[in-house]
Amino acid sequence: LKMFSLLSEFGWKPIMEKENIIGLQKQGKSITLEPGNQIELSGDKLNNIHEACAESHDYLFELQQVTKKLNLKIVSAGFDPISTLSEVPNNPKQRYQVMTKDMPNGGSLSLDMMYRTCGTQLNLDYDSEKDFIKKFKIVNSIVPISIALFANSSIVEKKNSGFSSYRSKVWQETSRGGLPEVFFDNMDFEKYADFSINFPLLFIQNEKEYLSGSNYSFSDFMNGKISEINNRLPTEDDLTTHLSTIFTENRLKKYIELRSMDTCGWDCLCSGPAFNTGILYGNLDEAYELVSKWDKNKIINAT
């Protein structure tokens, strides 16, 4: 709360959930806290990598000024190198309480993912369904390369984990995550819609309360089969929330979200986005032709 209060000096406004401040917003940007109080910047829609890099460094400068005043240090790594799971302070956000209860049922390291990992995520646009198909095929095919290039999470609980990216290991043993085989079969909008609709719900928002959705799919929601919320039908906000709980290495919203890179130090913050934009906004057809020859099973098993 002290950090959020000091950030208000830079024009950030609070986002409230009941009596709790759960984030900040300014223009098209927001700052939120993940389950283990990892700090996340969601940037504005920008035209190029240079604008995105400048925005990130402005945000980090503001954060640096605040942490100096509070005598805090920032750890920029893909996994908490010090704390045990039980030592991580919990975020009071309601949805995280439901996730903490249900997520371990589908993956043994799900709570480590929630409370101890940090990633560099990149949102990229597409201008047609054909463009999306090519880009989505490429980004899924290069996931092992992205993990290897930007690995930054070898230390766990003050010891060498034996992994260059322990964060990646955790994500492979996390509920609702991974690289689904169907992502390599020329995934188009209709196929992704089918995948998402039949994907299990994580939670359901009933007015201001979050309920477990573990017994239902989004298809059940669409067909009015969830008695706990009086069989109401989903809104666009419900769909947006559901899409954000599909924790695959890459996913589709109104943009393509790339999620396989560890958080890295400030000096390499723009490297991951530059790597991916170079591939996807360079010779797209050449990259697509190359990855189309790769064995999807080898890609999946390499992560």
Predicted ranges, named:
Residues 41, 122, 258:
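Conserved, mostly hydrophobic/aromatic
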Residues 45-52, 125-132, 262-266:
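A generic structural motif
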Residues 79-251:
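Loop-rich catalytic cores of soluble enzymes, especially ATP-dependent carboxylate-amine ligases
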Residues 1-108, 116, 254, 268, ...:
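Terminal catalytic/cofactor-binding subdomain
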